[in-house]
Regions:
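Glycan-recognition and catalytic cores of secretory/periplasmic carbohydrate-active enzymes
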Residues: 1-387
Length: 387
């Protein structure tokens, strides 16, 4: 196991999480019962496209992060757990939603955290059903989970959702579910991850034969470019696949995506929205991609057999988090309702551009949480003779 150093700025990270709690408390007071996606001019937007409502788990997920933070500090917490349950429970019907590929986004951020906090077996049943439901999107010809767009479409985003199928397989012992998740990940690896570690957003397949036809994109600059958020979905998602399977092919893929990200991102660790976008457009960063990358790197660094490379990923994640904390939070803008500025939802449709986005806020706080928990666990190991 990699022994992580103590070079974390705990004060900065704690202050940032304090601010995040304030912003979410303000959100639910001002917008009760609302599950936002992105801001417009810093205000959470109540209309506009939500497509599959794929972000609905992230707000309660933030509340569960805050509850766990309180609990691990020894503080009494009634508020955040109460609110987290209030916002998580209405998502239950989505466990049967066969129209979306986003059930991992929805349930791993919400119900899984609720289950971690309480170990109520009824919550685990919801998670298992969500995994089973998502598996029904599997296309035998082509060997992939189809996107919400059409049956011939495979998205890189689905790598963030396949984990809930792995989870259901592990909890039930259903080898068929595990096989579906593995085959989807291998297809994505083969067709959407390029040799240099960059990624395509979408693959199009022949429905008659299952043959791969071409790359496409819904969000990137072009079909042959590398949309930065898609790259970080792959970095994080393939790392999760390796956690479930210990298949070295998935670890290799996660590393290649991580290395591309770290090699091609600016010195502050925050990427352009698309790495191949024209120069004037490439100046626009996407902090949500940076937050996902930081969280993914913190998970990945613990799994590497090479402690030097593991420490490189750990240090890189901390560097990204420092940048986000110091330069991109809305702490100094009292009118701004989100946590993290500078996110991008949909560039081509001009939605949530240079704004707060709910997944960016969630993965930012998840990364801060994980960074501090790793440091605490390392200090505990040192206190027990390093064991």
């Amino acid at each position: 196991m990699i022994q992580f150093g103590p070079e974390i700025d705990r004060g900065l990270f704690e202050r940032t999480l304090d601010f995040a709690e304030q912003q979410v408390a303000r959100l639910i007071e001002k917008h009760p019962g609302y599950y936002p996606v992105y801001t417009k001019n810093g205000k959470w937007k109540h209309d506009g496209p939500a497509w599959t409502h794929w972000c609905d788990g992230f707000l309660p997920g933030l509340m569960w992060i805050f509850h766990r933070r309180k609990a691990e500090s020894g503080a009494q917490d009634g508020f955040w757990m109460e609110k987290a349950i209030e916002y998580t429970r209405p998502l239950a019907p989505r466990q049967f939603d066969r129209d979306v590929h986003d059930l991992g986004f929805i349930f791993l951020s919400s119900y899984y955290r609720w289950y971690q906090a309480t170990r109520d077996p009824k919550l685990n049943e919801v998670l298992i059903q969500a995994g089973k439901t998502l598996s029904l999107r599997f296309m035998e010809k082509g060997q992939y989970l189809r996107s919400f767009v059409s049956e011939d479409s495979l998205f890189i985003d689905i790598m963030m959702n396949v984990g809930i199928i792995f989870y259901a397989a592990r909890e039930t012992g259903d080898r068929r579910l595990r096989d579906i998740a593995i085959r989807h990940a291998l297809t994505t690896r083969r067709y959407l991850v390029r040799g240099d570690g960059s990624t395509a957003h979408e693959g199009i397949f022949d429905l008659e034969t299952g043959a791969f036809l071409r790359h496409s994109t819904q969000q990137g600059w072009r079909a042959d470019s590398c949309w930065s958020r898609g790259l970080t979905w792959a970095l994080y998602g393939f790392g999760s696949c390796y956690e479930y399977t210990r298949d070295p092919r998935f670890l290799d893929t996660a590393e290649r995506c991580a290395d591309y990200y770290l090699t091609h991102t600016n010195g502050d660790g925050v990427p352009p929205w698309d790495f191949q976008a024209p120069e004037d457009s490439r100046k626009l960063a996407d902090t949500s991609a940076a937050a996902i990358a930081a969280s993914g790197l913190l998970r990945l660094c613990r799994m590497l057999p090479d402690p030097v490379k593991g420490f490189y990923y750990w240090s890189s994640a901390l560097h990204i988090l420092r940048t986000l904390c110091e330069k991109y939070t809305a702490r100094d803008d009292p009118q701004w309702e989100g946590i993290l500025k500078g996110g991008v939802y949909h560039m081509h449709k001009n939605l949530g551009v240079n704004e707060s986005v709910m997944w960016g806020d969630y993965f930012f706080c998840e990364a801060l949480e994980n960074a501090m928990r790793h440091t605490l666990s390392n200090q505990a190991r040192k206190g027990n003779g390093g064991r």
